[in-house]
Amino acid sequence: MILKASSFKLPKPPLAYSLAACFLGLLAVASLPAQDTPDKNALPRDSQEKIDIDDVTRTYVVHLPPNYDQQQHYPVVILLHGRNQDAGDMARLTHFNQLADKDGIIAVYPNASHGQWNIGVRPEEPSPFAPRRGGGGRRGGWPGGGGGYPGGGGGGGYPGGGQSGGQNPEETKNRPEPPDDVAFLNQMLDQLALKYSLDTRRIYATGLSDGGFMALRVGCSMADRVAAIAAVGAAMPKTMICLPARAVPALFINGTDDPVVPDSGGNYKPGRFHVLSAEDSAKTWSKFDRCGEKPAQGKLPAVDKGGKETKTYTYSGCQDNAQVVLYSVKNAGNTWPGGEQYTSEKEVGKTSNALNANDAIWNFLVTRKIPGESGVQK
């Protein structure tokens, strides 16, 4: 006979048997290894934060290392994305979170306003940020298509917001003020310090292309808060006014075949200002830091098999034990060495795997500290 499921029932055991089984079950549970109880106060490892500045909401993304402990104190690396990119793009193309997880770093990815940083440089030509007759707004830029390179999407942007010679006063009269990104980053650090456990003597900034220019501005304007900087695919604008409050260690990583920020100097791709060569950029920063006159030259072996060596230029003997270093990456473009090829080689050049930018940057930054007694955020 086949029993239907609805009619098939186990007989009820005696009460004494039920109590014994329950007791044995409790013993078995008690003998199991203790399980970690989720901490209701634990912070999410990835979160988007907001901050209001001059009635404008700005955002940034925070990535915490595994097993983040509020009782410990962590170094912070600010990663500044390229033009027409955002925080998520920067995290994806650099893979920096992997290094942050391994070495216990809080990685912070700020979002620029409209995808472009105010790098504090007066444009040498009419700024596309100004309203123009016949319209015309921000064009192109990866990942949305069009221009494609983070250094400039073929139009749009405010390299510094100042009115330059040759502009029509009628066109600039009603120009909206560019955002104060130094104020944004300062308030971002204030907010971070309230929520997370930071070592405030070990805060660093790095960035790619337009973000690299912004990293240079951070070194110029936030030397009291940022211990050292690293600029990738960026160079010193000829018109940048830079007066660091102290000697700020700086690393430059430039590709020899960069079509956006020319390695030999010249016109920055969007056509708004000119840059020094990579070597002259490092030399200029070495003067800020009062380093020795001539750099020591060397070579780094390629990380990938068959890759080209990376030339190095190191300025030492600087004030406060600072250092200025240039890595000249053979055949690389306006890209993050060891990262993703985020758009076509025609637009930005090649991504080299001969150097791992994450390792090179962190090896340079890791020992740098703002001079002082203590940088631990209580």
Where are these regions (language model features)?
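Conserved acidic catalytic loop of the alpha/beta-hydrolase fold
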Residues: 183-200
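Bacterial N-terminal signal peptides
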Residues: 18-28
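Active-site-adjacent alpha-helix of alpha/beta-hydrolase-fold enzymes
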Residues: 256-324, 338-355
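Structural cue for short, hydrophobic secondary-structure segments
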Residues: 79-82, 109, 328
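Conserved alpha/beta-hydrolase
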Residues: 104-114
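Active-site glycine-rich loops that stabilize anionic/oxyanionic intermediates
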Residues: 82-85, 332
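Short beta-strand/loop motif that positions the catalytic acidic residue
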Residues: 252-254
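A domain-start/cap signature at the N-terminus of enzymes
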Residues: 32-76, 88-102, 106, 132-142, ...
